[in-house]
Amino acid sequence: MFNGFRFNGNRIGDRRWFCGGGGEPVTGTNVRAMDRSQEKEAIKSPIPPAIRVRELSFAYGGQTPVLNNLAWQVAPGERLGIIGHNGCGKTTLFLLLCGLLKASAGTIQLLGQALEAGKFLPEVGFLFQNPTDQLFATSVWDDIAFGPQNMGLSPAQVTERVNQAAELTGITSLLDRLPQHLSGGEKQMVAIAGLLAMAPKILLCDEPTASLDIKARRQLINFLGQFQQTLLISSHDLEFVLEVCNRVIIIDQGQIVADGPAQEIMADQTLMESHGLEKPYSLR
C-alpha cells in the first residue's frame, strides 16, 4: 500500500465485472431501467457510490446539448471505461467530472460530496491526454510536490511522498530535471508520480495513451492495473480500455446507449459498429 494506493500485481487481466446490480450488458432502452435499479441498490447499500451522476446535461452557449440527461454511478474500486466516436461527448463529460465546466442541469457527486466547478478535491486525481498540460513547475520534484503541498501536509511529509512516488515510478534520477526537457513517456511517469503522491480515491484518465510509445503505454497499463481505487478512463484506444477496465459505457449523441461488462459489450460487433466503433482486434 502507498498512502491509500493498494498495489496487487494480479489486477491486470482481472475480469471480475461490475454492472450495477446485474451481470448482463445493458443496451438501448434498458439503460434507463438499469439507472433506476442502480439508484435503488445505492439506497440499500451502506457504502455510497464513488461517483454518482444524476440527470446531467450540458450545452455550449445554449446550443444543442452535448450531454443529455445522463444518469449512472460507479462503485468504489470499480474500473469504468467510457468509449464513443469523436464528438460523442466524452471529453465534455470528463471536463465536468474534473470541475472545469459547470453542468447546464443535473448533479455530480464524488465520494458523497456535491462537485462544485473549480473546487480542488485532493481525493480526485486527473491524468490528461497530454502530460505537458499538468507539468508546469521548474523541476520534476516541484511538479510531484504540488498536490501534497496543497493538501496541507508538512514539508517532511511532502518530501517523503515525493521520494516514494519517484521510486515507485522509476524516475528518481529525474527529480532535478526540467519537465520540458523530458520525453513523452517520462512526462507521463512524472504525472503518474504526482498522482501517487496525492493518493487519490478516484482517478480520471482522459486519453492517457495518446502521446505514449509502446514501452510507456505498457508501463501505464502496469500502474493502472495495480490501482485498486476507483478508475475512470476515456479513450479511443479500445485494447487499452479492454485490458484495464472491467465495465464500459458507450456514449452516442450525448446519451448512454450501452453499459455492461467490458468484454461482453466490446465483443458485440453489431452494437459497436452501430455506434461508430470497431470491435477490438483481440476479440475478433
From Swiss-Prot:
Q: What is its main location?
A: membrane
- What residue stretch is flagged as signal peptide? none
| Residues noted as binding ATP in the record, renumbered to the chain | G84, H85, N86, G87, C88, G89, K90, T91
Is Translocase given among the entry's keywords? yes
Looking up Pfam families in the UniProt record yields:
ABC_tran (PF00005)
Keyword presence, Glycoprotein: no
The Gene Ontology terms for molecular function here are:
ATP binding; ATP hydrolysis activity; ATPase-coupled transmembrane transporter activity
Q: Recorded E.C. number(s)?
A: 7.-.-.-
List keywords of the entry alphabetically.
ATP-binding, Cell inner membrane, Cell membrane, Membrane, Nucleotide-binding, Translocase, Transport
InterPro entries named in the record: AAA+_ATPase, ABC_transporter-like_ATP-bd, ABC_transporter-like_CS, ABC_transpr_CbiO/EcfA_su, ECF_ABC_transporter_ATP-bd, P-loop_NTPase
Coiled-coil region(s): none
Domain ABC transporter intervals: 51-278
The domain of life is Bacteria
**Annotated GO CC locations:** ATP-binding cassette (ABC) transporter complex
The listed locations are:
Cell inner membrane
First-tier enzyme category under EC? translocase
Membrane topology, record value: Peripheral membrane protein
Function per UniProt? Probably part of an ABC transporter complex. Responsible for energy coupling to the transport system.
Similarity field: Belongs to the ABC transporter superfamily.
Question: Protein name, please?
Answer: Putative ABC transporter ATP-binding protein sll0385
Q: What is the native source organism of this protein? A: Synechocystis sp. (strain ATCC 27184 / PCC 6803 / Kazusa)
Q: What is the lineage of its organism?
A: Bacteria, Bacillati, Cyanobacteriota, Cyanophyceae, Synechococcales
